[in-house]
Amino acid sequence: MAPRKQREIFDATLRLVAERGYDGLTVEGVAERSGVNKTTIYRWWPSKAALLGAALVESDVLGFTVPDTGSLRGDLVALVEGVRRLLTEPPGSDIAVAALAAAVRHPELDGRRFFADRFARERAVFERAARRGELPGSADPLLIMDLLAGAVWMRAVLRGMKVGDDFATQAVALVLDGVHRPG
């Protein structure tokens, strides 16, 4: 499939899930909005779950660039800021919340693929930090990202709280420096 056509299909899929939720998403609706025949869509993706799963991972709408600021702290602040923007600024916030909330009720969506893909790219931050001596070998990069990204999800999505511009810096400081003061 031509990259432009695929992009149009994915964009239509994500816009529709943001507008109507997963239950209102149909391959027919995607076909109509993207201008592609539904049989073409089914040829590439056998179900709406497969289509949405592919769109979540491959679309530029939810994409991100892995930062390389030269320090673990700087890279983590940039990653957390990216998650904050994703979950608080449309259209990403509408798409992410609708699609990933649906994944809880519809295991066929395989939301794990979205998170696995993101972490596979985020891993480079930790590999560089380890080479620079900023991260002990015992550190668990997945746990670090879960703590940081999870904090944004809790505040922005589950609690409906405003996540300010300084949130990323504060969250990273707590994770890297801890809250315990010796003595």
Please identify what each model-predicted range represents:
Residues 1-35, 50:
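Basic, helix-initiating cap at the start of DNA-binding domains
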Residues 34-45:
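Short hydrophobic/aromatic patch on the recognition helix
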Residues 50-59:
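Alpha-helical DNA-contacting segments of helix-turn-helix folds
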Residues 55-56, 87-109:
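Amphipathic alpha-helical segments used for helix-helix packing
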Residues 64-93, 144:
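Hydrophobic alpha-helical connector segments
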Residues 78, 120-131, 158-183:
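C-terminal peripheral helix-coil segments that are non-catalytic and often amphipathic
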Residues 100-101, 127, 136-158, 166-176:
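Hydrophobic alpha-helical segments that form the core
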Residues 107-132, 141-142:
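Amphipathic alpha-helical packing segments from all-alpha helical-bundle domains
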